């Protein structure tokens, strides 16, 4: 409500490019869209350093992080095509090849042995500081965090979308009220929490 959260639609990488935001909690693959240069409204620009860190945790919270992303599957086909697909997947997930592939895209390796045996050495070969920082954060996350996955529900995507839309809508309204009467921020915080409790217990 005090203006510290980006509430507009679209990806959070956009406000980073214009200096409207300075921190983003995002997918690791967002590194593909980050820029080491900020361009301001007056068309001036400056170089910045982008640093990746493990997901933030409240002081009394558990170190947990959601694991999600694109998957690969096969469809029923001819024996030759199915064999070719399996051969490709084995090649892609072979430890060293997989590390080489993922470190160019911001993804995580798919095997534990990749973290243990290959990733530390691969980081030394990276030339882009953004990627070096990202994969150092990966090593920290892999060692110190517990991974969880989204519930396997047919309605999950719809629930997630509605959650995001409601949060943006409510916070945008309350943010405007805070701008109009900043002295009421404590009251608005309580009202906002109450609104969310009502919305998410229905």
Go through each PLM region and give its residues:
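A generic secondary-structure signal for well-formed alpha-helical elements
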Residues: 28, 38, 95-99, 174, ...
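Conserved C-terminal helix/tail region of periplasmic/extracytoplasmic solute-binding proteins
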Residues: 139-202
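Extracytoplasmic/periplasmic substrate-recognition and gating elements
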Residues: 1-3, 11, 39-112
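Extracytoplasmic ligand-binding clamshell segments of periplasmic binding protein
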Residues: 1-40
């Amino acid at each position: 409500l005090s203006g510290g959260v980006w509430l507009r639609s679209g990806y959070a990488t956009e406000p980073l490019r214009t200096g409207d935001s300075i921190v983003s909690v995002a997918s690791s693959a967002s590194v593909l869209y980050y820029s080491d240069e900020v361009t301001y409204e007056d068309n001036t620009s400056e170089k910045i350093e982008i640093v990746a860190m493990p997901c933030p945790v409240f002081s009394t919270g558990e170190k947990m992080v959601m694991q999600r992303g694109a998957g690969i599957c096969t469809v029923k086909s001819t024996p030759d095509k199915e064999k070719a697909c399996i051969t490709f997947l084995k090649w892609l997930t072979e430890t060293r090849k997989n590390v080489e592939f993922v470190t160019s895209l911001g993804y995580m390796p798919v095997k534990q042995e990749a973290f243990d045996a290959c990733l530390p050495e691969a980081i030394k070969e990276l030339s882009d500081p953004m990627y070096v920082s990202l994969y150092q954060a990966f090593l920290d996350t892999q060692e110190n965090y517990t991974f969880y996955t989204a519930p396997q529900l047919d309605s999950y995507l719809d629930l997630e979308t509605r959650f995001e839309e409601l949060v943006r809508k409510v916070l945008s309204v309350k943010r405007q009220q805070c701008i109009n009467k900043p002295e009421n921020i404590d009251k608005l915080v309580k009202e906002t929490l109450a609104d969310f409790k009502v919305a998410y217990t229905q």
